[in-house]
Regions:
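Structured surface interface patches that mediate subunit assembly and partner/cofactor docking
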Residues: 1-11, 16, 26, 30-35, ...
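Short amphipathic alpha-helical/adjacent loop interface patches that line ligand
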Residues: 17, 50, 54, 113
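A short small-residue
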Residues: 89-97
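Conserved alpha-helical segments that form or flank metal/cofactor-binding pockets of metalloenzymes
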Residues: 43-88
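Hydrophobic pocket/interface hotspot
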Residues: 20, 46, 152
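Short alpha-helical hairpin
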Residues: 25-29, 84-89
Length: 213
């Protein structure tokens, strides 16, 4: 975690938003219907999910440290149970979105995500939530958001038949670890795998070998 600086996380956060927009611009109308590594979502669904998540981050910051996410994590819910609850939340939020094309969702995501990024510096050291005795600050949660953008950039790239890797995967991994302590307790390390991007893809439930067929 010593590698993670405020400036580094904020720069990587902005890069994640930018690369999502760059990748989204490469999708044709037909390509938005393609499957993604997020097996339940096509590319257009993933665009909608990004829009929802960016808005959720605003809500969590508005209500910190008593947001609905903070209240859930304060119950010390297991990682598996948390994943199921968030999956249901994601599905409900996606279903409630207007039926618009993928580019419109991406534009809304970019506006919301960049606005969230501008809100982070003044609140950096404030408490965002607590999980099993670990206090997660707004800055640490920014690291989790940063990693989420880069992970979803990889999802979009793979849906296009391409690959993606952040410029500083070690920083992105460390940032995500700081913001998601619920995911790392007891996580086994695969022998011989010291690539931080590979580790993050696996830890986030992705198959690094996934390809668009």
């Amino acid at each position: 975690m010593s590698r993670v600086s405020r400036a580094g996380v904020l720069a990587a956060y902005r890069d994640g938003v930018t690369v999502i927009c760059e990748l989204a611009a490469q999708f044709s109308d037909a390509a938005w219907l393609a499957v993604t590594p997020c097996s339940e979502w096509r590319a257009a669904d993933l665009a909608g999910h990004l829009r929802c998540v960016a808005d959720d981050y605003h809500e969590y910051l508005d209500d910190a440290p008593a947001s609905r996410l903070a209240r859930l994590l304060a119950t010390n819910v297991s990682a598996d149970s948390l994943a199921r609850k968030l999956a249901r939340q994601n599905a409900a939020e996606l279903a409630a979105l207007p039926d618009v094309p993928g580019p419109e969702h991406i534009a809304a995501f970019a506006e919301s995500a960049r606005a969230y990024g501008r809100r982070l510096p003044p609140s950096w050291d404030l408490l965002h939530h607590t999980y099993r005795g670990s206090e997660v600050t707004v800055g640490a949660m920014a690291g989790a958001a940063c990693a989420e953008w880069h992970l979803h950039a990889w999802d979009l790239a793979r849906s296009l038949g391409k690959d993606y890797r952040p410029a500083d995967p070690e920083l992105v991994l460390a940032a995500w670890q700081g913001g998601t302590p619920q995911l790392w307790a007891g996580l086994p390390v695969e022998p011989g795998r010291d690539d931080p991007w590979y580790v993050l893809l696996l830890a986030s439930g992705r198959d690094p070998a996934w390809v668009q067929l």
